[in-house]
Each structure stands twice: as C-alpha cells, then as structure tokens.
C-alpha cells in the first residue's frame, strides 16, 4: 500500500487511537486539554499538546475546541520517519482524523522530542505567560530575551536540565528564554531550536505576545512543570505590580545545631 501523505491516513490505522486505557496518549491528550481549558491555557482552540510513546507521536489537531476534543480527533505519526524526511511541511501521518487539519505546532513538538528526548510537550496561550513577555519588552533591548527569577519555593518544581539528575533549589535562578513571535506558528521552529541549543538546561521557551512551550521527560513532568511555570508567571506579574524584584540576594538560612 502507498503510504498516506498530506495529513491523510488509511482508515485501518484508527486502531492507533482506540483504547480503553485512560493513560493511552489518545485518551490522555483530550483529558489534559480539557483541564488546560479550565485554566485558560487553550482558549478559543489555541494551544495544544503532544505525547511521544517510543516512536509514535500523538498530536492534538488544529482548530478543535480543546475542551471538546475526543480520542478520534488525534493525529499520529512516526518520529523516525520525520527525522528521515527532508520536507518538513509535507508530513506523512500514520493516522489522521477526517475533519481537522494538522497542528502548526507539530514541528515545535517534534523539536522537543528529537532534541530533548521529551515524552510530552505542552503549548499554552496562558495570559500570564504573555504578560511576562510584555513586561520584559519594557525593559529594553538586551534585557527582554530571558525571564529570570530566584528565591521562590516553586522553582523546585523544575529539573536541573537535560540529562542532569535532581531538581533546582530554592536559591537557584530559573532562566526561561524568550523568542519573537512569527505570523505562522510553524515558522517559530528554527527559533525554538536555537533557544534550545543556547539554553540546554531549559524545559520551556516563551514566545513573545503569544504563549509558552513546555516539555518534560514524561506527561507527569511536563504537566507539573507547566503548572509550576504558570504559577511563577502569575507571581512575577503581581510582584511587578508591587515593584518587587524577580531577582534577589538572600543569604541561605542554615539549621541551628542542637
């Protein structure tokens, strides 16, 4: 049989998204997106999520109301096949839903899977993420390319970096790079990849006036890091309203010896 292309797939591959297991990627993506919708992360069909299970990549479609998504709406492709293809804009999908278009986030999700071996990547349009990039914009050229914050307990929710063990500590500085937005989402790919190369320990990239991409080794880590990051973004916005600095110099407190 000739392989399907341009987002079309053989009907027989519907088995790839059929499972009674709630932890199956095709079931998990809709349930996660429904939760994210309640948080305002994927409003108006924006944002999305993708899960990698070995070589199979499951992706939420474009244009679907995320709180209403079903397993039958999910795209599936082979990660190895994408790595071998020279045409990034004409992807071959193992399975495609009949009524939707492939997500323009796809190449950005794939960057997290190929460059970081991530198991899950989440893209949100969180207004806290957007506000942080706008605040950084007011700092002037050269000071608007990174979000930095330290001495906040929630920073412990992030790993130390790619292929490093352990998590960041309370006194560590969390650094999230910021890239400029483009008219078409897929055109962000090279800038996201450049940020990943420049910041090898980051688990997220902010997109100015747009949102954020967050990834993790698995669904649990991607989700909790996304939650922690949104908490920190909201905190940072409210700190700025109170003229409180994001970076502080605090002496570590050591326990008294008994």
Curated annotation (Swiss-Prot):
Active site residues according to the UniProt entry: 153
Binding site for Zn(2+): 123, 125, 210
This protein's GO CC annotations: cytoplasm
InterPro entries on file: Aldolase_II/adducin_N, Aldolase_II/adducin_N_sf, MethylthioRu-1-P_deHdtase_MtnB, Salvage_MtnB_euk
GO biological process: one example: L-methionine salvage from methylthioadenosine
UniProt cross-references to SUPFAM superfamilies, sorted A to Z: AraD/HMP-PK domain-like (SSF53639)
Keywords: Amino-acid biosynthesis, Cytoplasm, Lyase, Metal-binding, Methionine biosynthesis, Zinc
Region annotation (Disordered) ranges: 1-21
Enzyme class: lyase
SMART domains attached to this UniProt entry: Aldolase_II
Reactions catalysed, as given in the entry: 5-(methylsulfanyl)-D-ribulose 1-phosphate = 5-methylsulfanyl-2,3-dioxopentyl phosphate + H2O
GO molecular function: methylthioribulose 1-phosphate dehydratase activity; zinc ion binding
Start-end of Polar residues biased regions: 1-20
Compartment list: Cytoplasm
Binding-site list for substrate: 105
Co-factor: note: Binds 1 zinc ion per subunit.
Family statement: Belongs to the aldolase class II family. MtnB subfamily.
HAMAP family: Salvage_MtnB_euk (MF_03116)
Protein name per UniProt: Methylthioribulose-1-phosphate dehydratase
The organism's taxonomic lineage, starting at the top: Eukaryota, Fungi, Dikarya, Ascomycota, Pezizomycotina
């Amino acid at each position: 049989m000739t392989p399907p292309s341009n987002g079309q797939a053989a009907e027989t591959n519907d088995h790839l998204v059929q499972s009674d297991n709630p932890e199956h990627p095709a079931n998990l993506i809709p349930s996660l997106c429904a939760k994210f919708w309640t948080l305002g992360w994927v409003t108006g069909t924006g944002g999305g999520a993708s899960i990698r299970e070995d070589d199979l990549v499951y992706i939420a479609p474009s244009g679907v109301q995320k709180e209403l998504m079903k397993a039958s709406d999910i795209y599936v492709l082979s990660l190895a096949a994408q790595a071998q293809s020279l045409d990034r804009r004409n992807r071959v999908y193992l399975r495609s839903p009949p009524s939707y278009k492939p997500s323009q986030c796809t190449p950005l999700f794939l960057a997290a899977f190929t460059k970081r071996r991530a198991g899950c990547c989440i893209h949100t349009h969180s207004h806290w993420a957007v506000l942080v990039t706008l605040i950084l914009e007011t700092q002037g050229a050269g000071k608007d390319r990174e979000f930095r914050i330290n001495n906040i307990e929630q920073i412990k929710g992030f790993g130390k970096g790619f292929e490093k063990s352990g998590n960041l500590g309370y006194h560590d500085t969390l650094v999230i790079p910021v890239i400029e937005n483009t008219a078409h989402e897929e055109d962000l790919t090279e800038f996201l990849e450049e940020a990943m190369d420049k910041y090898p320990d980051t688990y997220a990239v902010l997109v100015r006036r747009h949102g954020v991409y967050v990834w993790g080794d698995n669904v649990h880590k991607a989700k909790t890091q996304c939650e922690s990051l949104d908490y920190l973004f909201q905190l940072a916005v409210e700190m700025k309203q109170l003229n409180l600095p994001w970076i502080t110099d605090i002496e570590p407190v050591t326990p008294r010896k008994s």
